[in-house]
Amino acid sequence: MNRHSLAPRCALALGTIVASAMAGAGPALAQQSASSYHVASKVKLGREGGWDYLIVDTAGHRLFMSRGTHTLVIDTRTDSVVGDIADTPGVHGIAFAYDLSRGYTSNGRDSSVTVFDLKTLAPITRIHTTGVNPDAIVYDDFSHRVFAFNGRSGDATAIDAATNTVAGMIPLGGKPEFAVVDGKGTLWVNVEDKSEIAQLDTKTLAVKAHWALAPCEEPSGLALDRASRRLFTVCSNKLMAIVDADNGKVVATLPTGDGTDAAGFDPATRLAFASNGEGTLTVVHEDSPNTAHVVQTVPTQRGARTMALDPQSHVVYAVTADFGPPPAPTADRPRPRPPMIPDSFTLLVIKP
């Protein structure tokens, strides 16, 4: 995902999407949650750096967020800062391997992956990915591998989580964005510049399929309903596409807001989410595997295009900042971005 240190195009689509034992929850929960999402609080975090992916550590009740050169950790019970992982240069994404009690960050600036202790946050080692500018990163507990998706080299690096060594490289034929796994050996990743989803085997590292996503353009965020085998991908042309995870067929599309960049899915409520840079959160209900409808458009704040979902509390987290007026255009920068106002970085807590 592209990230600007001042006005980021952040794609957190949702961190690890986990199936829940609550997936059979009744329609009353979905109806109540869908109709009442709102920004319950805004927490000013300040500090330096832009931002990119967010991910919720459900076991530790923490929210991890990339901040340009460091990775900030928030206690989701108090919304306060409880840790900061230093020296993650150009950090984009964060992933967790609960079975190993380890976490991982993808560091775009030096094309590396930092391995850290998930409990203490202490760094363990740094792995050079052999790809250029790792962006999204996910852990697959089926193969016990970490997958880092390299934006500039158009490939993925598979890392053996037990040994912290590179297990292989996977050419993707384009710029990868977010990815999800099903826990059974299959991984899906958006290929942004090709408007495709690639399907991978996490054991053999073979690319099994490339699926065109038309009418979806430039997909970024991606989420998965493991029960219905449906992918939710969000697109730059204000669409969410629902895709059959087994054959790649686009079964439905729904409108989102401008600047859509991140996606999430709550298995308990069957709600899918798209966070939009215009300052809205689109909430979609999955009625059946092939039908869905928009149930709410939640006002958030301009720039809040990256998000994470806590599937236990059903809370959505987004981040943004305040921005000043854009500088005057130049030949080199005909459309300059507005600068972020120092110390204005803010966490939005969006509750049902």
Stretch-by-stretch model annotation:
Residues 11-24:
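Bacterial N-terminal signal peptides
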Residues 2-14:
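Bacterial N-terminal signal peptides that target proteins for export
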